[in-house]
């Protein structure tokens, strides 16, 4: 079975959402240390930092999303946003590319990495 790919924007949004849940879990763990105010406060502040990090990631992906190229997916016909040379449709996971040299090739996220000249 092949690698499960997802669009880059959706991956970053999922990461930001997971930061929120981690923050809540860390804060919840802090409640178990009610007898030690210092440890409880430490866990609460750490959880808050996870939630603030999530806010920063959401803000960053929002600004990145406004600069993304909008294309119409040939498979489902919906407008999707692309980051980089190759990406997947956000709705149907159809491989998309803006580079004519990559058309017809097997989808690989490595095409987005810049090659170093040696």
Swiss-Prot record:
Signal sequence bounds: none
Lipid bilayer topology: Multi-pass membrane protein
Cystine crosslinks: none
Bilayer-spanning residue ranges: 12-32, 42-62
Subcellular location: Cell membrane
GO cellular component terms attached to this protein's record: plasma membrane
Keywords tagged on the record: Cell membrane, Membrane, Transmembrane, Transmembrane helix
Main subcellular location: membrane
Domain of life: Bacteria
Family designation: Belongs to the UPF0295 family.
Stated name of the protein: UPF0295 protein GWCH70_0499
Annotated organism of origin: Geobacillus sp. (strain WCH70)
């Amino acid at each position: 079975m092949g690698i499960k790919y997802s669009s880059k924007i959706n991956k970053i949004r999922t990461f930001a959402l997971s930061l929120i849940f981690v923050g809540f879990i860390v804060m919840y763990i802090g409640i178990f240390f009610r007898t030690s105010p210092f440890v409880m406060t430490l866990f609460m502040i750490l959880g808050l930092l996870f939630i603030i990090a999530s806010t920063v990631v959401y803000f960053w992906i929002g600004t990145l999303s406004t600069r993304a190229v909008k294309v119409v997916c040939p498979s489902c016909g919906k407008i999707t946003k692309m980051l980089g040379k190759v990406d997947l449709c956000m709705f149907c996971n159809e491989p998309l590319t803006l580079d004519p040299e990559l058309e017809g090739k097997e989808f690989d996220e490595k095409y987005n990495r810049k090659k170093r000249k040696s």
